Amino acid sequence: MMKPDLNSPLPQSPQLQAFGSRSSDLATEDLFLKKLEAISQTAPNETVKNEFLNKEIPSINKLFTRFLKNRKKVIDWDKINPPPADMVLNYKDLPAITEQRTSELASKLAVLKLNGGLGTTMGCTGPKSVIEVRSEKTFLDLSVQQIKEMNERYNIKVPLVLMNSFNTHQETGKIIQKYKYSDVKIHSFNQSRFPRILKDNLMPVPDKLFGSDSEWYPPGHGDVFFALQNSGLLETLINEGKEYLFISNVDNLGAVVDFNILEAMDKNKVEYIMEVTNKTRADVKGGTLIQYEGKAKLLEIAQVPSSKVEEFKSIKKFKIFNTNNIWVNLKAMDRILKQNLLDDMDIIINPKVADGKNIIQLEIAAGAAIEFFNNARGVNVPRSRFLPVKSTSDLFIVQSNLYSLEKGVLVMNKNRPFTTVPLVKLGDNFKKVSDYQARIKGIPDILELDQLTVSGDITFGPNMVLKGTVIIVANHGSRIDIPEGSEFENKVVSGNLHCGAL
């Protein structure tokens, strides 16, 4: 199919004109739009072409135009304040909910898991949600089991909603067939697919709608509001009598439904709740909840002026961070979407190198929506509600005796003398799940572990015990094989050691 002349005017169709206010860089904006329209001409059929023209192009162009308008705009640091006491509820102060009230609220709830990520950072192919994390169960298995247990206990039907990306949608559709007899209703939808943008000239990277997947990206989990509306599921959930949606990352094993939080939301007519928790040294880069011009606002490190980054990382000033566990009133979401208020969500500019090209991705975060909802609040929750598995170091912790699995929920071992989780850093030799499994013959007893650092060519024997601070380093070209039953407490191990040497 011939490509249109990029210098010719665009068709005067409503879907290509209704993009709202223009930026000052009209030439760039117009050329970007023409490039998108040219991409649409490569669609395999009219249905796909019209879908891209009517839904994707307006969304892409709206985000790009706002980026052009605001790219030189910086946050006014002097207007940033810690959230006042009444903006962040303390979880410990929330009244306990009765069993009858729990059943009432559960009937109004839907649960959404953000399922767009791949397992590539852990050396796996396909959706990250199918990695086995505990007792041969995957992230998705645990999510389904939790909802199944809740539905049976309260005799209700809370649905599970999965927001996939173009990277995970097709395979997820096949995987969820295994749950068709589980009595858990699963809705699955695909979030948007935006073109990566060349950093030097701000033009789309792809020239075909279905060329290389590496030329496209999902525009962040903030797309959940728009994608839920575009899929028709927002309307479906409201029509089914659902009033509340609990959103979380599928890899956060601590993000289970908590009816004390939902009761506080319902009782106080709160439209949006962001769960936050106290920062540790490991969380200094996490987004934080602030008060800005009298409103609740999410502040991400990418928005912070370079001169203020160290201040942002300070635990003294910014004591909490966003867990990305979010509770939303569905009717309020529907209202603000129809009012186009979320079109002003903050844009995160994510620079990358892809296929040797310097590119940028324009992304939005689900937490950035907080400032557009009425009576929005944070809830400072226990650390146990933030248990993400981003690496094999995290996998090491959740597979250990630090936790047990009860009805799909990870519960910390009562014999752990501290409430904190140990800091574990496994080196590059453990980065892939396959290498991690080959090198660790059995997860050690870590009930009394504070910190573990492992670097180099190392293998763990079964039935080990680690306590306090343990550092194990194999020098370059050397190897350490730790024998079965070894016990280390506040110990540094280095050099070149083999089985039986310790």
UniProtKB/Swiss-Prot annotation:
InterPro entries: Nucleotide-diphossugar_trans, UDPGP_fam, UDPGP_trans. The keyword Disulfide bond does not apply. Disruption phenotype: Cells undergo aberrant differentiation and development ending with small, gnarled fruiting bodies. They also have decreased spore viability and decreased levels of glycogen. It is an enzyme of class 2 (transferase). Residues 1-20 are annotated as: Disordered. Belongs to the UDPGP type 1 family. Plays a central role as a glucosyl donor in cellular metabolic pathways. This is UTP--glucose-1-phosphate uridylyltransferase 2. It comes from Dictyostelium discoideum. The lineage of its organism: Eukaryota, Amoebozoa, Evosea, Eumycetozoa, Dictyostelia.
